[in-house]
C-alpha cells in the first residue's frame, strides 16, 4: 500500500470513528461489555474494530465488547519464528487466503463445541462479515 493510499484509509477510518463513536473502553463492565444495540452495517463494524470494540452475541440486542486485556495482532509487525516457518514449509497442507471466505465462516458457525450450545456467528453476523470481506 502506498503512502497516499495509507493516508486515505486512515482518513476514512477517522471519519467512521467520528460518525459511529463508541463509549470509552474503560467504561466497559468486568466482562468487557461496553454497549448494546445498533446494527452490523459495514461502517459501524469498521468503526468498532478501529476503536477496539467487537460484536459478540447470540440474539438481539447486539452486544459490543472491549475486554481488557485484549490481544491485537498487527500483521505488518508480526514476526514468524524460524521453527514455525520451518514447520509451515514442511507441513502436508497448503496455506491460501481469500479463496473460500463464506465456506470457512459457515464451517466455523456449524462446528460443534463441547459444553457450548449454539454459536455467536448468527445469520446476521455471517452476512455482515461476508459483506466486509466483499468490500476488501
Regions found by a protein language model. Give the residues of each.
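N-acyltransferase acceptor-side catalytic subdomain
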Residues: 1-136
